[in-house]
């Protein structure tokens, strides 16, 4: 099992809050939930940060009471946001874990 040269393999994990957010957003019928899977695939594939920044407005969040250092924000379209982070895998030294933390609108996540 090898990732791109010099890259660690990645896996995805979901917080309990993210799972609830996902169900709520999917049930509303107003958001393209396939975009969540698409971005997850890009993150696992080590897509260059420049590509994510250009297409999805990927950027770091400022650490505060709500968000931790290392948390990032991707704009999936309009007012549809994904908060995630990438950490070393807790059990496998040669892997990273992409953690989907929250999903929602600006009002849901920052208001």
Which residue stretches match the model-derived regions?
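Basic, Lys/Arg-enriched alpha-helical interface segments
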Residues: 1-78, 87-97, 101-111
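Acidic, metal-associated active-site segment
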Residues: 84
């Amino acid at each position: 099992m090898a990732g791109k040269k010099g890259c660690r393999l990645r896996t995805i994990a979901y917080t309990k809050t993210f799972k609830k957010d996902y169900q709520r957003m999917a049930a509303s019928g107003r958001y393209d939930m396939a975009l969540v899977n698409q971005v997850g695939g890009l993150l696992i594939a080590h897509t260059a940060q420049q590509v994510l920044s250009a297409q999805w407005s990927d950027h770091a969040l400022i650490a505060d009471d709500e968000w931790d250092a290392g948390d990032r924000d991707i704009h999936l379209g309009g007012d549809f946001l994904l908060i995630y982070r990438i950490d070393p895998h807790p059990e496998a030294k040669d892997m990273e874990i992409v953690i989907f933390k929250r999903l929602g609108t600006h009002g849901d996540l920052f208001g």
